[in-house]
Amino acid sequence: MIQHPRIGIRPTIDGRRQGVRESLEVQTMNMAKSVADLISSTLKYPDGEPVECVISPSTIGRVPEAAASHELFKKSNVCATITVTPCWCYGSETMDMSPDIPHAIWGFNGTERPGAVYLAAVLASHAQKGIPAFGIYGRDVQEASDTAIPEDVKEKLLRYARAALATGLMRDTAYLSMGSVSMGIGGSIVNPDFFQEYLGMRNESVDMTEFTRRMDRGIYDPEEFERAMVWVKEHIKEGVDRNREDLILSKEEKEKQWEFVIKMFMIGRDLMVGNPRLAELGFEEEAVGHHALVAGFQGQRQWTDHFPNGDFMETFLNTQFDWNGIRKPFVFATENDSLNGVSMLFNYLLTNTPQIFADVRTYWSPEAVKRVTGHTLEGCAAAGFLHLINSGSCTLDGTGQATRDGKPVMKPFWELDESEVQAMLENTDFPPANREYFRGGGFSTRFLTKGDMPVTMVRLNLLKGVGPVLQIAEGYTLELPEDVHHTLDNRTDPGWPTTWFAPRLTGKGAFKSVYDVMNNWGANHGAITYGHIGADLITLASMLRIPVNMHNVPEEDIFRPKNWSLFGTEDLESADYRACQLLGPLHK
């Protein structure tokens, strides 16, 4: 059984015996326990289990104790460390020198002992040795007897832990390409060096004929297939067929296509993570899967010109339920856009929520909306908005039909209930695919995302000579008047899932206007997650050494390793590029 990645907590202490160290043992170890309790009681793994922490076997005052802690962490699948101390310690003697995992240090802000002095000293050693570390120092002085973790310290500890866990969850997993390059899209030209060096992942690949092989040879669970057919007939609403009359399939042909796309879903899932049921059926090799944390399906055009498209498969892999019940989502990219798949993966690992994959299709200015519909935009939409619409697939969680405190949300699967599942299904239909584009047919997904949800749109791009760069745009989904929505939606493809998105403007750079956001977006796709998580993404990017070229996160929320400030404090964007370039990828 594969262990969850864990956070290692390192209580460091003044090594002087005969009174000094002894007086600090309890306080120092209690700091470590408090941090472990905070993380385990607040954060969860994608499977819903509490995040696990490992505390060093003793306080760390000298090198042998640092070495003992290091050995324990190696055996315990520790993916990141947090060092805590209320006092002076011996900097380079007590630091963790593992170069391939993130590190953070919390120095207690008190007057009795110089925790802040150790923090500064050990961070200087980290910078000198080229091993980045995040510095955490409370804004307010605390009493030595105060065991509470201040709110500003909590925020940084949790931000660090979320991002660090994401690095650990990605390590030693795979990206699975089902097919190859789709329609010349750059993101589907999969770059194995990026995955290996920045994410610690490997690349797997299967030809799309693997789907037809498994169908023809019965390499799927026939009992599950029958159960799925019953569920689909009961719960899935087939939408309006908008095809030309000569392209409309007969009822019998559509029935066959439903069977086909259900099998596609089952096979796509089994390819990613395996299925022990296949071994029982005599298919031991296929039963193991590809250990894929994220995958993509080429589809267009070689597959979709002949077979039903991947929309149903992609939709339900990214959704948190199917005929087997509520479960965690998969991360699955349309058109094998691996870079958007990774963007979705970053979002997912930071939030444990499903992801919207969308084309960044159209910028609608207030003037254009007024001209076309007669409607004057107000509120969040007053400066215009972006039409996010994928060509046929999207997680059903993207409907916004789940709620928390009466507001629409996208939330982890363990919070989802059956009434919310039914609401998602009732607010979605599955029209036959547009056969001018998808000659082989299939069924697209059609819904409208509810408005007033805080969301973050993300995109990873590869820049020759630089490497990966990340873009982040926080904003809100919009709910337009029904007639305005239909007028605008019908100008594209009303059989596809739509999200209206207004990024939050800052008045400068790429966020001077909504037009500038669209104009500076690096690719045709974006990954959209629930919540404003730009600060977490910036922290994660710094751990992976990926510079952020565009974001609208307030400066006070940016949390990067301390040595980033040594690359400059006035122009943080340029300092980020220089730090990432000098340090190089996390796993190189």
From Swiss-Prot:
EC class: isomerase
Active site: E335, D359
Pathway as given in its UniProt record: Carbohydrate degradation; L-fucose degradation; L-lactaldehyde and glycerone phosphate from L-fucose: step 1/3
Annotated Gene3D superfamilies: 3.40.50.1070, L-fucose Isomerase, Chain A, domain 2 (3.40.275.10), L-fucose/L-arabinose isomerase, C-terminal (3.20.14.10)
GO biological process, one term: D-arabinose catabolic process
One cellular-component annotation, GO: cytoplasm
A single MF term (Gene Ontology): L-fucose isomerase activity
Binding site for Mn(2+): E335, D359, H525
Pfam families, per database record: Fucose_iso_C (PF02952), Fucose_iso_N1 (PF07881), Fucose_iso_N2 (PF07882)
Entry's localization field: Cytoplasm
EC number(s) on file: 5.3.1.25
Free-text function comment from the UniProt entry: Converts the aldose L-fucose into the corresponding ketose L-fuculose.
PANTHER family, per the entry: L-FUCOSE ISOMERASE
Similarity field: Belongs to the L-fucose isomerase family.
Protein name in the entry: L-fucose isomerase
